[in-house]
A protein has these predicted regions:
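Mature, soluble, non-transmembrane domains
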Residues: 100-224
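Bacterial N-terminal signal peptides
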Residues: 6-19
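Short solvent-exposed loop/turn micro-motifs enriched in small/polar/acidic residues
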Residues: 29, 88-90, 208
């Protein structure tokens, strides 16, 4: 029983070190909320993300975090959040922002936190990250695409619906968002579910399964 528990634990927390230890895709599920902040000139000045991990992953990581860091839970989660963000940095925080087909890199988040959130009597871990944009693309009149995904598809990310994407903007802007689901073939789905722990070359699979958020903003009185 102890061997099984350790195997499950390694599978669930392996993404923290970015070395996927086990197969069958996906292993964990993340529900996201994304907020885009535009200034009076219609420039994107900040992106705020919230990732809610599934109940099973959350329960195991809460226990493992306290055990590893040997600290009370709030302090242990601070240490774990720092490690998560550091490990996500080389992968651009699994985030892809395209404005008029040009990719904009996210800077390191100026604030982040890993906290326990309660919903319907259950506890979930939520990672929040706040990015102040160093490059400020203009949203007004632009074609904007936003995706968050694990390239290997070990973790499935989803906003679930467009209402989990919000856009804070000045009154002179009018913005809308649309959730676009991927077009998947039966062959691709079968391949993803056939993978086992020996598979390592799965880069690109996450992109194929990734949803896209399409954002359109217009200045009031302007028509494209």
């Amino acid at each position: 029983m102890m061997v099984i528990q350790k195997s499950i634990l390694a599978c669930c927390v392996g993404w923290i070190t970015m070395i996927p230890p086990c197969g069958a895709h996906p292993h964990n599920w993340v529900t996201m909320r994304s907020e885009f902040v535009a200034n009076d000139e219609g420039e994107l000045v900040a992106i705020n993300q919230t990732w809610r991990f599934d109940f099973f992953f959350s329960a195991i990581l809460i226990a493992e975090t306290v055990n590893e860091w040997q600290q009370p839970l709030p302090k242990a989660l601070e240490f774990e959040a720092r490690r998560m963000v550091q490990n996500l940095a080389p992968y651009q925080y699994f985030s892809v922002l395209l404005v008029n087909e040009r990719e904009f890199q996210l800077p390191a988040p100026d604030r982040y936190a890993l906290q326990v959130a309660k919903s319907e009597g259950q506890e979930f871990l939520e990672l929040t990250m706040h990015f102040q944009m160093t490059q400020r693309p203009v949203l007004a009149g632009s074609t904007v695409s936003w995706s968050v995904y694990d390239p290997t598809y070990y973790i499935a990310y989803s906003h679930e619906h467009a209402d989990n994407v919000t856009i804070r903007h000045a009154s002179n802007l009018s913005c809308s968002q649309q959730l676009k689901l991927p077009k998947l073939t039966e062959e691709l789905i079968a391949y993803a579910f056939s993978l086992d722990q020996t598979e390592r070359d799965t880069d690109g699979l996450g992109r194929a399964f990734a949803e896209k958020i399409l954002i359109a903003c217009e200045r009031q009185g302007e028509v494209r």
